[in-house]
Amino acid sequence: HNSIGTLTIRDNDRNYLIVESPAARIDFRRADGLITRYEADGMRLLDAGAVVEPNFWRAPTDNDFGAKLNEKNRAWADPGLTLVSLDHTLSDGVAVVTARYDFQRVTGRLEIEYRIDNAGEILIRQTLHAAADKGEPDLLRFGMRMRMPARYDRIDYYGRGPWENYADRKDGALVGRYRQTVDEQFYPYIRPQETGTKSDVRRWRQHDIAGRGVEITASEPFSASALHYAQEALDEGLTKQQGHSQEIEPDDAVWLSTVWGASTPGDSFRSGNTACHMEIMNSNSK
């Protein structure tokens, strides 16, 4: 046990590193360093069996297929993230957990630092050191995602809207505050592909009907989406399967994705590091 004030790190569990206070509990799985339990202010913010995980991929679009990015960069869909170390410290009322990774299928290193306070609020800094070699695949996006229980089906965000928008097609989407539902996010393209993302976001709130949930902000404007579909369900793989969007069954959950760097459809990119802040919202949040 390490403790300071009411914040405690339990490192004597065989399978989990546990950060807890009277108001919150966050479990890190020792096998991969990922958050597998996130509870705060009486809320269970992760769906059963879900994790908070880094994400380097999105469902390919028609333009991506045309540029063959679905083939060239496919390694980043599952880069073989391998935990190298999981360290923790506790000082000044903040628990700091640092996970470091290598990749099996691409050349690079990843570090994720989590700074957790008594309320269960998390400051996440994710840093990617990717190889700059010409032959290495590029990322389609750089961010994180988590699967939340279906009750968190409301969105309140400040960014571009009200419809989906991306770096290369956003001029017609004005910056403002928008309140929407997850059901409204999925655009039924004829063929399944990336959909529903909002860009230039300053603040994203994912909450239930009572206004309880999480608020995400970042060190600079970011993109985000919340769907009833995992990106894997919208990804047809190496070749077009001529599937139809209406044939895909929605999940009884909410897939929340935050994106700190992203390619435009038909293009790709490389990125460095960023920080995002995940804050707990109670029913009094405005």
Set out the residue ranges of the language-model regions.
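Beta-strand/loop-rich accessory regions of lumenal/periplasmic or secreted enzymes
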Residues: 2-286
